[in-house]
């Protein structure tokens, strides 16, 4: 088997060979001989099974194993020809051609390697920003929110239901005139405007009077968890029994202890300072996500140019396409299923964004290495568990779900990115005058 290989650029190489039928058959025969020594077939002693019997029973499996072995041989021989090591490879080689004719196989592969990333001078592209300011009014509003949060619910006498009120009501949902499982409850308590129910439901209850009944028309989101309801129109029959609300209490000693349970003798000044820092942190996070990160990303991909592994770019294109799939109409989905050329053309629209995303990922990875930024397994576990608690789901099941979907590396990368950007943008702060 003669292998030809050449570097396409610093991150990709092409390999080509033709495997003769005799070479493939020899591989299969050799594997069958090895298997015959250990395999057990009724009527034959262990180690005495004829090769012909092994081939008869396991021939197809052995042929697949032989092809896999040839595939590995091609990769290894290619690495020698282009002076690369197996540790340089990133991802799986892409099979561009695998044509079988008269027992011979014409194979073309593309092998990708970890890119050579240099980020010298990254300090020059860190955007400047001013420390977010926090006003007295913002602190007072936040304290008022906390006071309302811990206040008990009370029945409210008012004309009709408004945003922010708590509604005690009965409901039953129908799709195509039929009630569906899980779509009924009595005496249910819901904060109007909280977004707990499907879009349109809470808005449809606005203006409802105590004792009044109403049909609320909604449409389940296309990505709704229950597949049999996803995208369906529904009617919910609701009856309002009571309107409840919360009144902000006083900021007394007892309330301060509730709001700051870890402080021995909490004071209003301590609470204000803590809230001020939290508001500032929230504002900075917003600034980071909406302004600083995008600016840095645009400048980074423009400044740091390097060859990208094609297989990783292709994976990113596929991922972006899959993410967008749910946004297509039924007609569009049907068209893509039936028209391969239209599917290919649509997939190509994600290429530029995918290239930018992959490029930025490698830049972030290199910067994180230079700055010694890591995320431990314990930190990753805590983050996944915390997310589970926020959504009220079992943390162990949530972790297992992430493992099955292969999402843990992506979560870890996102955490490294967050640490990195918080570290980077410290040096971009040109003004720190507080209020």
UniProtKB/Swiss-Prot annotation:
Note on domains (UniProt) = Consists of 3 domains; the N-terminus binds the ribosome, the middle domain has PPIase activity, while the C-terminus has intrinsic chaperone activity on its own.
Instruction: Write down the Pfam families for this protein, in alphabetical order.
Output: FKBP_C, Trigger_C, Trigger_N
Concerning NCBIfam families, the annotation shows: tig
Family statement drawn from the similarity comment of this UniProt entry: Belongs to the FKBP-type PPIase family. Tig subfamily.
- EC class, as a word, reads isomerase
Its EC number(s): 5.2.1.8
Task: From the Swiss-Prot or TrEMBL record, give the protein name.
Answer: Trigger factor
Task of the protein: Involved in protein export. Acts as a chaperone by maintaining the newly synthesized protein in an open conformation. Functions as a peptidyl-prolyl cis-trans isomerase.
- Could you read off the lineage of the organism from its UniProt record? Bacteria, Pseudomonadati, Campylobacterota, Epsilonproteobacteria, Campylobacterales
Can you name one GO molecular function term for this protein? peptidyl-prolyl cis-trans isomerase activity
Q: Which UniProt keywords apply?
A: Cell cycle, Cell division, Chaperone, Cytoplasm, Isomerase, Rotamase
Cellular component, GO annotation: cytoplasm
């Amino acid at each position: 088997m003669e292998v030809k290989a050449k570097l396409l650029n610093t991150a990709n190489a092409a390999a080509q060979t033709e495997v003769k039928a005799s070479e493939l058959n020899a591989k299969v025969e050799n594997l069958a001989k090895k298997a015959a020594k250990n395999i057990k077939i009724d009527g034959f002693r262990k180690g005495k099974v004829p090769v012909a019997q092994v081939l008869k029973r396991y021939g197809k499996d052995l042929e697949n194993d032989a092809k896999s072995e040839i595939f590995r041989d091609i990769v290894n021989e290619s690495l020698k020809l282009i002076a690369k090591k197996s540790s340089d490879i990133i991802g799986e080689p892409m099979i561009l051609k695998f044509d079988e004719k008269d027992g011979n196989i014409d194979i073309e592969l593309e092998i990708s390697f970890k890119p050579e990333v240099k980020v010298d001078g990254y300090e020059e592209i860190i955007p400047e920003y001013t420390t977010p300011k926090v006003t007295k009014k913002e602190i007072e509003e936040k304290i008022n929110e906390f006071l309302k949060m811990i206040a008990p619910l009370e029945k409210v006498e008012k004309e009709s239901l408004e945003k922010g009120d708590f509604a005690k009501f009965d409901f039953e949902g129908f799709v195509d005139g039929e009630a569906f499982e899980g779509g009924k409850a009595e005496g249910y308590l819901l904060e109007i405007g909280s977004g707990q129910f499907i879009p349109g439901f809470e808005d449809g209850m606005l203006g409802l009077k105590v004792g009044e009944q109403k049909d609320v028309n909604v449409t389940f989101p296309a990505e709704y968890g229950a597949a049999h309801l996803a995208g369906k129109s529904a009617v919910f029959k609701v009856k309002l029994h009571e309107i409840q609300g919360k009144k902000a209490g006083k900021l007394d000693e007892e309330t301060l202890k509730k709001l700051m349970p870890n402080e021995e003798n909490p004071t209003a000044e301590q609470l204000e300072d803590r809230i001020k820092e939290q508001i500032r942190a929230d504002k900075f996070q917003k600034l980071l996500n909406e302004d600083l990160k995008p600016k840095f990303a645009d400048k980074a991909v423009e400044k740091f140019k390097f060859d990208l592994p094609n297989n990783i770019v292709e994976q990113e294109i596929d991922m972006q396409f899959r993410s967008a799939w749910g946004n297509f109409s039924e007609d569009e989905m049907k068209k893509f299923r039936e028209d391969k050329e239209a599917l290919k053309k649509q997939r190509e629209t994600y290429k530029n964004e995918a290239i930018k995303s992959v490029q930025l990922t490698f830049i972030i990875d290199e910067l994180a290495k230079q700055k010694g930024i890591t995320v431990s397994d314990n930190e990753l576990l805590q983050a996944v568990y915390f997310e589970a608690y926020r959504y009220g789901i079992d943390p162990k099941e949530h972790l297992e779900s992430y493992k099955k979907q292969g999402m843990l590396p992506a979560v870890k990368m996102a955490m490294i990115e967050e640490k990195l950007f918080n570290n980077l943008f410290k040096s971009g702060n040109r003004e720190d005058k507080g209020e």
